[in-house]
Swiss-Prot record:
The keyword Isomerase belongs to this UniProt entry's keyword annotation: no
UniProt keyword annotation of Cytoplasm present: yes
GO biological process: ribosomal small subunit assembly; translation
Function per UniProt: Required for maturation of 30S ribosomal subunits.
Classification via PANTHER family: RIBOSOME MATURATION FACTOR RIMP
Family: Belongs to the RimP family.
Natural source organism: Allorhizobium ampelinum (strain ATCC BAA-846 / DSM 112012 / S4)
Name of the protein in question: Ribosome maturation factor RimP
Length: 204
C-alpha cells in the first residue's frame, strides 16, 4: 500500500497541464493521487474502445508497478462516479508514463538529461515551434536543446523556456531504454533499503 503524503509536502507543479474536460478531470483526481503518494503525469480522453479515460501517474522516484496502477484505479473510480465529469460510458485506464514518456515537470528534464526528445512550443523560438534533439543541460527556467538535425543557418543549441512548452516527449532509443532500466533498478534498490531501515527501527 502507498503511504499518505503529509500536507506540507506539496507536489512539484506540472509545466504542461490539460485544458477543457481533461483539465476538469485532472482537478478532480489529482488530490486523490497525491494523497496516495503518487504524482499525476497526464489525463487524456481517447476515442478508443468506445471512449477511454487515460490517466498516467508515477511515484516520485519515477516507478509505477501494476499493483500501483490497480490501487490508483480503485481509488479514482468512486471519486469519478460521484463527480461524474464525463456524460458518456468510458473505460478507465491507469498506467505508467512509459519509457518514451511525456515530460511535464522540470525534474523530468533533469532526470532524463542527455536523452533525445521532441517538443512543441506555444511561441516561435528561432522561427520554429517544433524541435527535436538532446537535452544538453537544464536551468532553473528552461533547458538547452542540442539539435540532432541542424538546418542551414540554425544554431545547433538553443534555450527553450519551460513557460513556452506546449508539449514534450522523450524519443525511444537504445540509450533511453538503458537509462530507464538503470533508473528503475536504482529506485527499487533505494525502496528496499528504506523498507529494511524501517523494519530495523521497529525491532529496536
Amino acid at each position: 500500500m502507498s503511504e499518505h503524503v503529509p500536507a506540507d509536502e506539496a507536489p512539484e507543479p506540472r509545466l504542461i497541464t490539460e485544458t477543457g474536460l481533461d483539465r476538469r478531470i485532472a482537478d478532480i483526481i489529482e488530490p486523490v493521487i497525491v494523497e496516495l503518494g503518487f504524482e499525476l503525469v497526464r489525463v487524456r480522453i481517447l476515442n478508443q474502445n468506445g471512449m477511454t479515460l487515460q490517466i498516467m501517474a508515477e511515484r516520485k522516484d519515477g516507478t509505477m508497478t501494476v499493483e500501483d496502477c490497480e490501487e490508483l484505479s480503485m481509488a479514482i473510480s468512486p471519486v469519478l462516479d460521484v463527480e461524474d465529469p464525463v456524460d458518456k460510458e468510458y473505460h478507465l485506464e491507469v498506467s505508467s508514463p512509459g519509457i518514451d514518456r511525456p515530460m511535464v515537470r522540470a525534474s523530468d528534464f533533469t532526470r532524463w538529461q542527455g536523452n533525445l526528445l521532441k517538443c512543441e512550443t506555444s511561441i516561435l523560438i528561432d522561427n520554429r515551434k517544433r524541435f527535436r534533439g538532446k537535452i544538453a543541460d537544464v536551468t532553473p527556467d528552461g533547458f538547452i536543446l542540442e539539435r540532432d538535425q541542424v538546418a542551414y543557418g540554425e544554431e545547433p543549441r538553443l534555450t527553450i523556456p519551460f513557460t513556452a512548452l506546449a508539449e514534450a516527449k522523450l524519443i525511444l532509443t537504445d540509450d533511453l531504454v538503458r537509462d530507464a532500466l538503470r533508473a528503475d533498478k536504482q529506485a527499487k534498490a533505494a525502496a528496499e533499503a528504506a523498507n529494511q531501515n524501517d523494519e530495523t527501527g521497529e525491532d529496536q
